[in-house]
Regions:
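Mid/C-terminal beta-alpha module of Rossmann-like enzyme folds, strongest
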Residues: 79-124
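N-terminal plastid-targeting presequences
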Residues: 1-2, 25-27, 69, 97-98, ...
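Conserved SDR Rossmann-fold cofactor-binding beta-strand/turn motif
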Residues: 56-61
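Conserved Rossmann-fold NAD(P)-dependent oxidoreductase catalytic core, especially the SDR/UDP-sugar
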Residues: 1-37, 42-47, 53
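Glycine/proline-rich active-site loop of Rossmann-fold NAD(P)-dependent oxidoreductases
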Residues: 18, 63-71, 96-106
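A conserved pocket-lining segment of Rossmann-fold NAD(P)-dependent short-chain dehydrogenase/reductase
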Residues: 69-83
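A short, structure-level motif marking secondary-structure boundaries and short turns
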Residues: 25-28, 77, 121
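Conserved beta-strand scaffold positions in the cores of enzyme catalytic domains, especially
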Residues: 52-54, 108
Length: 124
């Protein structure tokens, strides 16, 4: 009833922002029904009147020691092939605690691990 903000998680690559090799690998390794569901969920938020932030995640893996992340604005090529779940949690915490929410208001932001510009995640 008094929802002030929604953080939605979605997959990266739905807007053609991945390099060709990473995009091909991603879509070759996910069921089309999953990709369609991700698009539909993203569109529900975009068509709402909510203050939302959609976080576009690349391939996830676990590493409690690695919380490195970078934020990639929508419309910018997203080169990072992977990011840790721990880094995503840190990014969400950081976004929720910024003084100025303006960059995140009704925005779609990619989260990736710096320096992981691979054709597929390193763990595959």
């Amino acid at each position: 009833k008094n929802v002030r903000r929604v953080i939605g998680l979605s997959m990266a690559g739905l807007s053609g922002e991945f390099p060709a090799a990473l995009e091909k690998w991603t879509f070759d390794n996910l069921p089309i029904s999953y990709v369609q569901g991700e698009r539909q969920a993203r569109n529900v938020l975009r068509e709402s009147n909510l203050n939302y932030t959609i976080l576009r995640l690349t391939w996830l893996y676990n590493d409690p020691e690695n919380t490195n992340y970078e934020l990639i604005p929508e419309g910018v090529q997203f080169n990072d092939a992977q990011v840790t779940r721990e880094a995503v949690v840190k990014a969400i915490f950081d976004i929720l605690h910024v003084d100025d929410e303006t960059p995140f208001h009704r925005a779609s932001i990619g989260i990736g691990e710096p320096g992981t510009h691979y054709d597929k995640p390193s763990f595959h």
